[in-house]
Every structure is written in structure tokens, then in C-alpha cells.
Amino acid sequence: MLKAIILAGGRGKRLKPITDYVPKPLVPIKNVPIIEWQIKYLEKYGIKEVIICTGYKTEMIENHLNMKNIGIKVKFSIEKTPLGTGGAIKKAGKMINEKSFFVINGDIITNIDLNKLAEKKNVIASIELRTKYGILETNEDKILNFREKKEISDTWMNAGIYHLQKEVLKELPDKGDIEKTLFPEYAKKGKLNTMKFKNSKW
């Protein structure tokens, strides 16, 4: 059974001032911390072990999960200095023996189907780009169509969930973001795939 890496080492600057006191994985959504939502989600798809990449307020996350009855095995990959998403995956990947694994960003709550995602190698889950603003279709200064707060058709965004082959680990930087290093290189070589999830919660 595959393992999953949760990228939870960031400081959560966009959630300040909350994250001045609580690490982003422990920020509650409907009174349940994000990290618990994620573990339940991964457990639903048969994941038996997660590796949580931490750096900021690691002890708070460890202590919280130790007090909970978590149904799957939890390990920690601790960054003494920020490594970026690529460096974090590479470091955590040393604990993975399987041929492939999942990666999920530490601030996501979703229902994207991991079984479907696992059908492809080196694949990024993508969802339709969403906006809270009305969309105008124009011809010079005339509005042809007005669409209120919805998905932008045929424009897809990275959902922050990946199914990767173990071989990618040796190509990742020791420090740096996977989105700025490996993914662009793989895309140019035709080695990076996506699976589109329409109408998924995210």
C-alpha cells in the first residue's frame, strides 16, 4: 500500500496572525484541525502511513497527534531550515521503499479521488480555475457575456496533490520548490501528466 507525504513545513504567512501562535496544520476548519481532515482523507483511500514534513512549530503538531487516536502510522521529516517543497519531498522520500507515493500540500481539504490519480505515473491532480469574481467576455468595449463567480472553463490549476514515482527523488533539489524545478523540466520532456477533476471539493 502506498504512503503519502504531507507538506506541512510552511509558516502559513497568509493565515497570520493565527499562525503566529498555531502552525497551519493545526488551524481548525469546523473545529477540526486541517491535518486531521487530511489524515482521515488519506485513510479513506487505504493509506497506512503518512510522513509529515514539518519545520515550524513541529512539537505542537507532534504533541497534538500523539494525543489523538490516529488510525494510521505517522512519521515526521523535520526540516531545521526551510527546504522548499522539492527539498522536503526528497528528504521525506528516504523513508519510502514503495515504487510510488502520494504528496499533498498541507493546507488542502478535498475529495479528489486518489484511486483514480494512482492510475497515472508522475501526475498532478488539477481542478478548474475558480474565482470569486464575475467573469466578463468582451469584444473591445462591449460585454458579450457575464458569468458570476464560477469555474473558468478549460483553465486548470494545480490542486497540490501528486502521485510520483520513486525515481523522481534523485532528481529533486536538496533545497528548492518542486513546482519551480522538477515539474517544469519534466513538462518540457513530456514526462509530467495531469488528471482533471471536475466539480471536486477543494
Spans of features found by a protein language model:
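Short beta-strand-to-loop element that shapes/binds the nucleotide-sugar donor at the catalytic cleft/hinge
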Residues: 56, 123-140
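Catalytic-core segments of class I nucleotidyltransferases/pyrophosphorylases
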Residues: 101-102, 109, 115-118, 130, ...
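Conserved beta-strand scaffold positions in the cores of enzyme catalytic domains, especially
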Residues: 26, 76, 122-123, 192-194
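Short, well-ordered beta-strand micro-motif
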Residues: 28, 137, 163-165
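Conserved N-terminal catalytic core of the sugar/cofactor nucleotidyltransferase
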Residues: 3-6, 14, 28, 32-105, ...
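Conserved catalytic-core motifs of eukaryotic protein kinase domains, centered on the activation segment
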Residues: 17-20
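Active-site glycine-centered loops adjacent to acidic/histidine catalytic or metal-binding residues
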Residues: 10, 107, 128
